[in-house]
C-alpha cells in the first residue's frame, strides 16, 4: 500500500513541540504527529482529527515519532474515537513508541482503540 499525500495534506507545528502531517493511503486518513503531545501542543493533533468530514471515516494515527504523551493526548484520542465511531468509521493507532505505549496501556486506551505494532498492519483491511 503506497502512501501518498492527501489533497489537503498539511503540516502544522512549532519547533521543539509537536508537528502534525496528514496524508492518505488507500482512502484512509493517516495522521503523523511528531514530538511531544501535552497540554501545550495537543491542539495541533486535535485540529488534525477535527477535520475529519467523510462519512464513515477511516483514520490511523501513526505514533512512531511521538516521544511523550500525557492525559491531554489520551483525551483527544478518546474524543476522536467517539466521533469517528459515531459516524460509522474507525480509528487505529500505529507503532507507538515504548513510552507512549506504556501510557496507552496504563489507562487502557489500547482496549478501546486498536493498536498495531506498525503502520502497514494498521492500514491493512
Question: Where are each of the predicted segments found?
Answer:
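Amphipathic alpha-helical interaction surfaces in cytosolic regulatory modules
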Residues: 39-113
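Glycine-centered tight turns that cap/initiate beta-strands
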Residues: 27, 109-112, 118
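General small-molecule cofactor/ligand-binding pocket signal
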Residues: 21-23, 94, 116
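STAS-typified acidic loop motif
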Residues: 4-6, 10-47
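Conserved catalytic submotifs in the C-terminal HATPase_c
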Residues: 25-26, 64, 96, 120
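A charged, well-structured terminal subsegment
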Residues: 117-125
Amino acid at each position: 500500500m503506497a502512501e501518498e499525500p492527501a489533497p489537503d495534506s498539511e503540516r502544522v507545528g512549532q519547533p521543539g513541540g509537536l508537528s502534525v502531517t496528514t496524508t492518505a493511503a488507500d482512502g484512509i486518513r493517516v495522521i503523523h504527529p511528531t514530538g511531544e503531545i501535552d497540554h501545550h501542543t495537543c491542539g495541533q493533533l486535535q485540529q488534525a482529527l477535527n477535520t475529519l468530514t467523510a462519512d464513515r471515516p477511516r483514520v490511523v494515527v501513526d505514533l512512531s515519532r511521538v516521544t511523550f504523551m500525557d492525559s491531554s493526548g489520551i483525551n483527544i484520542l478518546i474524543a476522536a474515537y467517539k466521533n469517528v465511531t459515531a459516524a460509522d468509521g474507525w480509528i487505529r493507532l500505529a507503532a507507538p513508541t515504548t513510552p507512549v505505549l506504556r501510557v496507552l496501556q496504563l489507562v487502557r486506551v489500547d482496549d478501546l482503540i486498536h493498536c498495531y505494532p506498525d503502520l502497514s498492519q494498521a492500514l491493512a483491511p
